């Protein structure tokens, strides 16, 4: 089956054998000469030899004896050159026969080294051999050592004289070699150095035996309890014995009760278990007795007997863990035997060996004996003026190589001393390396210290062959020019300058001149065109009629950056662009340029018309909203016309038709803004002339639009019209609105004057008030009530609030004022600047605030705020200081733009690469899976509504109204606005819908899982390249937003921090997961991390859900009624608190001056705060600062203090005492005294704050901060502060984590070493003799315990299953759980961001997908960017495509191999049919770069990044690219397998109809 235009449909990459290289070659290059300096003809047998590579001129030999086409194919007898086209100099290879074999550096120095991996040597060792530093010795086994050698992991199989031997390889220095191997008598050793000997060893490798051996070594890696049995004992005795020992140990530990005497003979428990497993002993699972024979019911043998016995005993005694725990432990014993790196290396080597076996490659071909010389025209030598030459670097590299090669041949012929020959061989090897890849090992530079470009450099990077010439080519029939606005154009037109059109359409014009008889020949026509005769223009007009052209504006960030238009010929040299298509191109007319391309073929023209025409691209594919909208002047005109003015001329008049009203308006009887009544249909409508005129522009039969039109309402209007009437009518409507908008804006004569910026009268009062509040904050700070960080946070908060208040005051003043224009009184709404901002025409409230309110806070480059706000505005002017502060933000904006544009561009490139082969491949994949879709809620606030998330999706199950039980929508319905509105009204909160994440199509995605094509509002059609659309939709806003930072000029607006919970709708509140304490003022304090408050309506349906932070004060009781606007809870947003849960005396432990805490004395206030901070690293090990509350009932509550926490105890209550520090004394072996803080009878009450941890200071959030977060998520990187999450449900216990405990008593110090046990005492505790320190260690003395803690151990224990998990937490990390808390799977135990891999492992693939989607959406939402979920889902799907094999079963995979999920599923199906053992695999998360590099297509991966590595791997494994993706087809010049390049469209024939009749659009 042939696909596309090319005669093949797959491409395989292999290593070239020497014979293959010779078959390409047309002769050997023996001399390093290039051209003769006098004749400038190529030297014979040189690098440009005409005899080898072909003639310099078409059909002419070098000496000139044969000239002309008639001698084609003749070989000249004088100069030996074949008479043919000179073009063959671009395709004929030569070759160089190397005097000694040389290694190919790609296979030598890739990581891991391919040659090294096959020989089981490290990259360093194999390099030493190749570069003649060390000897390689092959050690053959003696007959009695054969078995040992073949079982050893460190040997490799070779075939010698037809027999396979397992041999050991040694890399030894010259001295070692001389000493140990050189004079060995027995014939066991072969040795040599350099590539030649390595080639010999590679050629005798027995690959089949090698693959078998590696599989055998890897086999036990997957073993578990199920594999126990005689076979395992036979093949893997050591491992088998370890597991038997472990089981015996567990039988003893849990008193499982298995008898140890058989027929009166006493046996060890190990032997009994071995007997049961090997099926020679039977076990009664109820009594634990054993016997030689099967005695009926309850008697079992083999490993299952042990399992049944365990389960039976557990039924009696719940303290024994479930048997799964034992199985898990057995698995861990196996894993301990295999280090991760070892398994990885084994798998890599096995893959390589199997690659060689499958691909018919030979390992010795990685060492070159013949080197190809590429055609001379691809490494040209060009004569410049003045007798100089410009040459390609390759010629220099080939010259060095030929020189060294010839010298080596001469030395060998002369029988030179070994040391000289060896050095020359090494130099030859180095010159081969440099030719293939300069810089991999040493760099060769030109005279100007520039590294020479090697063959690899011609492939890789932006300037390499892939990206420069194959993925992006310069095209003919194109031109570029500056753009200007063309307001009179229709939407599908563009103005094309005549001179440009003439050049672009030249061939068409020639043809038309001939057809019309103006010219008799092409030559004649050319002449006419050159002279620009009048007939030429006439023909040009006819030619361009209905011949679309493509316009493109760089940077091409999404598909709307290229659109088709019908050209309209215009005078001048500038392209005219329709104003409405500026937003999709992101174009303006300040000097932007655009490129024009002419589609030549009839198919191309048809595609341009049907698919790319601007009227087809009204909706954005990123979110389905209109992207072609009136903007700026047009919005202003429409806004102006649609506003009322009370008391305008003609107010209150009544008209019986629109026409009457227009007549009155034309006769100046009524004003355009006057409120009048007009009969529309059967009713009288209150409206004005402006609105009537706007409705004239709307489609016939559309509802009467009677509202003020600003940018948002216009957008809704256009979307609605598009929904009802489709693209064509919408385009016409837009054109009419454009005309009217421009006209009204002109008529209104709106302009900006300095007087329009009204400075609010309240400003001075508000600013003064803020300064007064600032003084209060400073005062609190000086008194030491708050810390410096809190002061900063409060300052920012005050100024953010003040700026907001000033802005409000300014707007309300503008709205109340009056304008007088031409003697006409207009309300404040008509203030020109206000009107521009309010209508969305230009500018926004922020900019208005800066013009007439106050500039507010400015951001530093680090993202923090400068505390001094700019209280002036631009109308008043800034003071010098204020101006200086301003420059900060403005400069940040410009620097950001430069840096972040490239960052966003690179992100887009990675996204495109990872998703490029996602194409709609079928209508329905038939999956039964679905996603549960619900609104995205972030800290109690709904960020993305259910409706927004559902539109355009396909339902997976029927939906019924939860109350009336009637059917709302059926499965497989596509959800549009009406259906989603009905679903929401019914109060459905979760909907099961189809999703890209669950699509089961083999390649690509199916239409049903994808849903709507958002730019067409209909189910996506097959062949749509949805992956690339997704990448563009995510990447484009990134680029946009980073480019847009500097427009605000750095005036930062801090988000006012949420510090209270305000109810939005009345109802009944319900608490879930809150734990409340009454504090000394009677207030209720929440001490749960998981608290949620729900608001329910009278029917008990949830209408709001809010999370409540720890330490929030709750102001209502559970179940009370609340009204809208009630404050239910409030908290301090700037601190995390540690709260006393009980009353009692407060005791400080290990709070030591200048050791575990530092006193922060404030220079301004003279107040002191005590901050936890370890001054030396080892202090953190020796001391654990904590607060203990001793309650009246004798209980102790202990609170660890994390780093940076501040004690909330009045400084004057703290006393200090010098005392001996037992831990330090012990560590430093002499008395160490510390200054301890202590409290004298200090009592606390429940709810008291005993310490606080200040949160990070408020920073400016813009997408510049957000883009790195998006990248962190898509690349699956580790966050800076990873959280620990629980893997099981259970109760939390917290222990000290230490290696030793000391008890210090008057008699002396006693040390106890702790090994893998839990410490039952706390640091600093007084212990009595006999107190348990751990389960097995008891204190021999009474005294004070010193625990040298590294941190804490959190143990989660599940009583039902007996499972427990232990987590080590380093010192200084904040624990979110306390002793005795109950946690669920996936709950966070410490602060920080959870690791994506952990979420995957613990909560599963669905939770991870939800998490990723939400996190990415939040970053964009924060910027007000709408991206449909499905685009992000496509990228996430690509990140989760891979599975890692846990147990290969009977499959062709090996353990730990990463395979594509589709491949895995196919293999599972195959094995199911054959009734074999099914392989097991786990999903893994792969970052987008790695995902793009590990795609099936090696062409696509090589053109993305790390070209040489990808090609090396592809060649050694003999990979086949089946050309299924888009990118690889672009590279080889095929039609792409998407859109109209699909197979279905192959047979569509297109003809040009001579007489075009008026065709109606089929609806």
Swiss-Prot record:
Class of enzymatic activity (EC top level): transferase
A GO CC term attached to the entry: DNA-directed RNA polymerase complex
Gene Ontology molecular function terms on file: DNA binding; DNA-directed RNA polymerase activity; magnesium ion binding; zinc ion binding
UniProt binding sites for Zn(2+) 2: 925, 999, 1006, 1009
Gene: rpoC
Family from the record: Belongs to the RNA polymerase beta' chain family.
Record bears the keyword Signal: no
Domain of life assignment: Bacteria
Cited HAMAP family: RNApol_bact_RpoC
Function statement: DNA-dependent RNA polymerase catalyzes the transcription of DNA into RNA using the four ribonucleoside triphosphates as substrates.
Catalytic activity: RNA(n) + a ribonucleoside 5'-triphosphate = RNA(n+1) + diphosphate
Protein name, per record: DNA-directed RNA polymerase subunit beta'
Assembly with partners or alone: The RNAP catalytic core consists of 2 alpha, 1 beta, 1 beta' and 1 omega subunit. When a sigma factor is associated with the core the holoenzyme is formed, which can initiate transcription.
BP terms from Gene Ontology: DNA-templated transcription
Entry note: cofactor: Binds 1 Mg(2+) ion per subunit.
Entry keyword Zinc: yes
Entry keywords, A to Z: DNA-directed RNA polymerase, Magnesium, Metal-binding, Nucleotidyltransferase, Transcription, Transferase, Zinc
CC cofactor: Mg(2+); Zn(2+)
E.C. numbers: 2.7.7.6
Binding-site residues, Mg(2+): 588, 590, 592
UniProt xrefs under InterPro entries: DNA-dir_RpoC_beta_prime (IPR045867), DNA-dir_RpoC_beta_prime_bact (IPR012754), RNA_pol_asu (IPR000722), RNA_pol_N (IPR006592), RNA_pol_Rpb1_1 (IPR007080), RNA_pol_Rpb1_3 (IPR007066), RNA_pol_Rpb1_3_sf (IPR042102), RNA_pol_Rpb1_4 (IPR007083)
Entry binding sites for Zn(2+) 1: 61, 63, 76, 79
CDD domains in the cross-refs: RNAP_beta'_C, RNAP_beta'_N
